[in-house]
Swiss-Prot record:
The keyword Hydrolase applies. It catalyses: Endonucleolytic cleavage of RNA, removing 5'-extranucleotides from tRNA precursor. The lineage of its organism: Archaea, Methanobacteriati, Methanobacteriota, Methanomada group, Methanococci. Its main location: cytoplasm. GO terms for biological process: tRNA 5'-leader removal. One of its GO terms (molecular function) is ribonuclease P activity. Consists of a catalytic RNA component and at least 4-5 protein subunits. Part of ribonuclease P, a protein complex that generates mature tRNA molecules by cleaving their 5'-ends. GO terms for cellular component: cytoplasm; ribonuclease P complex. Belongs to the eukaryotic/archaeal RNase P protein component 3 family. InterPro entries: Pol/histidinol_Pase-like, RNase_P_comp-3_arc, RNase_P_p30. This is Ribonuclease P protein component 3.
Length: 232
């Protein structure tokens, strides 16, 4: 079983990997955009991780408002990477993603919206299909004034829904360079300001549980969740 606190970011260089470890992370999901995917880049990032005794997992974020294109990309990348994210914002995309158990994380459901991008129906779908909701801390930090308060409100609203319906939640630094990297304690401290400490702890541990689940499904002996070939 995978243990530890794992960040989700866009860090692929050796200095970034060293910084993540120094800041206290146990591992990292290195996320590429689906239209820029490079197996060579992720392989080199994994090698940097191995060199510095740091776990690196592969991720792809699919960004499109076209459902057919999104579903084709999901089929294309599901078996190529450890973690699959889809950028939200469009309400139809939000709903479709939460209906699909092939996706791990709905990223930024509030993106470019006047509301939080979720309701009780969508939260239940996420719970049923094990699709996590992402709180992107980097997006919050980059925003200003009204936009920042709007994102913060969306975070709080989505946390209430997720907690009520037991929908998984992850928090990410979303860092793309060493200057965007935050320590686990910083993200945990932020969560403590918008929800209770026990729930904050659960959120911090969710990314590693998602990875553990996907690694389990990749085993040759596992046909699907709960169905495994046992050799006598």
């Amino acid at each position: 079983m995978l243990e530890g606190i794992i960040d989700i970011n866009h860090i692929f260089d050796e200095e970034g990997i060293k910084t993540l470890k120094r800041f206290g992370w146990d591992g990292s999901v290195a996320v590429q955009n689906h239209n820029e995917y490079s197996e060579e880049i992720i392989n080199s990032t994994v090698e940097y991780g191995e060199k510095h005794d740091f776990k690196v997992f592969s991720g792809v974020k699919i960004s499109t408002k076209n459902q057919n294109e999104m579903e084709k990309a999901i089929k294309k990348y599901r078996n190529k990477v450890d973690i699959l994210l889809v950028e939200g914002g469009d309400i139809k995309i939000n709903r479709r993603v939460l209906e699909m158990n092939d996706v791990d994380i709905l990223s930024t459901p509030e993106l470019n919206r006047m509301d939080n991008g979720l309701d009780h129906i969508l939260a239940r779908l996420g719970s049923t299909n094990r699709v996590a909701i992402e709180l992107n801390f980097g997006n919050l930090l980059k925003s200003r004034n009204y936009d920042r308060s709007k994102i913060l409100w969306a975070f709080q609203r989505n946390l209430k829904l997720a907690k009520k319906y037991d929908t998984p939640v992850v928090i990410s630094s979303g860092a793309s360079d060493i200057y965007g990297i935050k320590a686990p304690g910083d993200l945990r401290g932020f969560l403590n300001t918008i929800t209770d400490p026990l729930y904050s702890k659960k959120i911090m541990e969710t990314t590693s549980k998602i990875i553990d689940y996907r690694l389990y499904l990749k085993k040759d002996t596992v046909l699907t969740l709960g169905i495994e070939i046992v050799e006598e």
